[in-house]
Structures are given as C-alpha cells and as structure tokens.
C-alpha cells in the first residue's frame, strides 16, 4: 500500500505481495513534488507492472538511473520521461549518490536488494537526512555506515 499526503508518504509492503507500479508527473506545489520522484522510481523498480515518471521541474533529476540499472532495475529514459518496468528483485551493487534525492532512492533500493549494496557519496544524503542510517536501523533495516580512509 502507498499513501501520499500533503506532508508525508508511507509505503507498506511484504515479500508475499508486490505493490503495483504508479505513474507520477512532477509539477510545482500542490502537485507531486520533484523531491520525491527518485524515491518513487525506486519503488516502481520493484513493483508489479510499469510506472511512467514525467519530470517537469529539473532536467538532471534522473542521475540515479544508471545506478538503479546496475542493481537490476529496468528503466528507460526518453528526455523528461522515465519508463520503469518492475522487476522481481534488485541485486546489491556498488553505486554512487550523485545528489541527495537520488542517493536516498539508492538507499531504499539497497534495502530491498538481494546482497550487499555499497553507496559512495553519502555526504550528499547527510545534507538532507540527519543520521538516516540510525533512523532506518531503528525501523529494522540492516544498514551501517562504514568510513573509508584513503
């Protein structure tokens, strides 16, 4: 189930039931916010069916697509439109957060993926989500931050 309210969104899922892909079109308030587009794309990537995402606000909001593909997502981009065909499972991979919203989508995809997902560039995610790994861990997610010293 998915609930999208004025100030929040909730997604409930179980491994026994695949959710249905959704179509969204971003536009200025009060329409669907561009800041949630990447997370919905991660949701559609593992949902049943095909979701169409139209990005009307920012031209560069699909930067996370190559990394979702690396995890097994079936996504095709044509200009400002992404076609997301749901797959039964994603696979852990080494990916890079190139921006805050795309990075959070990679975290969500990584939580659902089979195997280990390593995300570099998490400093960008930190800008918008304080202690996100602690929050997700408190909800039962298997996630940890590992510092890498060069």
Regions found by a protein language model. Name each.
Residues 129-130, 140:
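His/Asp/Glu-rich mid-to-C-terminal helical/loop segments that flank catalytic regions of hydrolases
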Residues 1-12:
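Single conserved hydrophobic/aromatic residue that forms the stacking wall/gate
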Residues 14-57, 83-127, 144-150:
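Structural motif
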Residues 8-9, 72-79, 140-150:
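Short, well-structured beta-strand/strand-turn elements
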């Amino acid at each position: 189930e998915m609930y999208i309210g004025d100030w929040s969104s909730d997604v409930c899922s179980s491994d026994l039931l695949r959710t249905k892909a959704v179509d969204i079109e971003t536009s200025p308030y009060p329409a669907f916010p561009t800041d949630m587009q990447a997370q919905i794309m991660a949701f559609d990537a593992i949902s049943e069916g095909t979701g169409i995402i139209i990005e009307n606000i920012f031209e560069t909001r699909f930067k996370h697509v190559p990394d979702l593909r690396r995890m097994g997502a079936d996504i095709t981009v044509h200009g400002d439109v992404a076609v997301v065909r749901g797959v039964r499972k994603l696979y852990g991979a080494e990916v890079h957060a190139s921006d805050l919203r795309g990075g959070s989508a990679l975290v969500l995809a990584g939580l659902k993926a089979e195997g280990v997902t390593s995300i570099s560039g998490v400093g960008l995610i930190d800008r918008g989500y304080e202690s996100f790994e602690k929050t997700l861990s408190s909800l039962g997610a298997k996630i940890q931050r590992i510092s890498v010293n060069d």
